[in-house]
Amino acid sequence: TQDLVMFSSTHEDPNALAKQAEEIAIRESGIERAYGWDYDRNYDIYVANGDGSNLINLSNADGYDAEGSYSADGTKILFASNRQAYSRTLSQAEQALFEDDSSYFMDLYVMNADGSDVTQLTRSPVYDGGPFYSPDGSKITWRRFNPDGNSAEIWTMDADGRNQRQLTAAGM
């Protein structure tokens, strides 16, 4: 039996090759840029067999779906997503914030390992990402960036999203 591999990818983005060509041209031009990350709205979470066969898109929603991690028993997947920015009408103020920083609506979600039953766990006006389950599956730990995005703190909550609390205070 083969092990499944979970990953996030934009390979189904119809503009992926054009974006790649643009990035290559920038690098070849000698232009130096500060590090940046693109929360591409075409990121989705996939599973496949270890040899790449049986590729399945689990999240298949408009928005950045990435940073996935399995529960210890393999039945759940935690992930970060800004799908709310694409699935509802934003106010003018929200639209301006999102255009300035596409991580503005980044919250944590959980879904079954087959991609069903997606549930939003956090609702924060800042970036929530990098979620992991505790070994017994009762808690989730993640990072939450401050509003300017310059530092992050470690947070924890119950596996159902209740009892959120900050564990560190280094950057605040």
Predicted regions and their residues:
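Blade-loop segments of beta-propeller domains
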Residues: 1
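Hydrophobic beta-strand positions that form the internal "hydrophobic ladder"
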Residues: 5-6, 77, 140
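A flexible loop/linker signature enriched in serine peptidases of the S9 family
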Residues: 8-44, 59-65, 80-107, 120-127, ...
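Short loop/turn segments that connect beta-strands within beta-propeller blades
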Residues: 49-53, 112-116, 158-162
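Residue-level detector of Asp-centered blade-edge/turn motifs that repeat once per structural unit
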Residues: 72-73, 135-136
